[in-house]
Regions:
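Glycoside hydrolase catalytic-domain context in secreted enzymes
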Residues: 1-187
């Protein structure tokens, strides 16, 4: 919904209203996207947004904060771009600290389609990969592939190229997926 309005308050309130309207129907959930700093479509796989903490909070994150706090969407989709040199899907500060700890988000965090394990090699910045994406707080890969699975298994075995994953970290993410399935099925 980053395209609803350039005004963060207006975008947040409109998105919150839409989210409440959809989610009032049993078994329906809304995914808010693209979290965050996705302000362009051209070259979006290759962009790195350099944003101060104040501008991030006052301008770019405010609309997301409003919809999370006011409407409790079932899911958030990360964006392709990097934020200050880190893929948004690999940013624990963004996904765990801000989204979950500060705003109280309890839903599912998912990647945009084919963010991890991308086969493109012509990008300025390396593609996001599965293990760091899980460690940062993503539960669902869209669509996920064999490269992702192998990266996760290597990280669990302590042989990950970038990070190591513990069984408890993976179980935490899996529990969030199960909670979402039950929430939507039980509605």
């Amino acid at each position: 919904f980053e395209y609803l309005s350039e005004d963060a308050l207006l975008a947040g309130r409109v998105a919150a209203g839409i989210t409440r309207g959809v989610q009032k129907h049993p078994g329906r959930g809304v995914t808010i996207k693209h979290f965050a700093f996705n302000n362009q479509e051209t070259n979006r796989l290759n962009s790195c947004s350099h944003v101060s903490k104040r501008a991030a909070r006052d301008l770019y994150l405010r609309s997301f904060e409003i919809v999370v706090r006011e409407a409790r969407p079932h899911a958030i989709m990360t964006s392709y771009n990097l934020l200050n040199g880190v893929h948004t899907s690999e940013s624990a500060e963004l996904l765990e600290t801000v989204l979950r700890d500060e705003w109280g988000f309890e839903g599912l965090v998912m990647t945009d389609w084919v963010v991890a394990g991308m086969t493109r090699h012509d990008l300025k910045h390396p593609a996001a990969t599965s293990a760091p994406t899980i460690k940062a707080g993503n539960e669902l890969f869209m669509p996920g592939c064999e490269t992702d699975r192998q990266g996760i298994l290597s990280a669990l075995r302590g042989r990950g190229e970038q990070v190591e994953l513990s069984r408890s970290e993976l179980e935490k993410q899996a529990a969030r997926v199960v909670r979402m399935v039950w929430a939507l099925a039980g509605s």
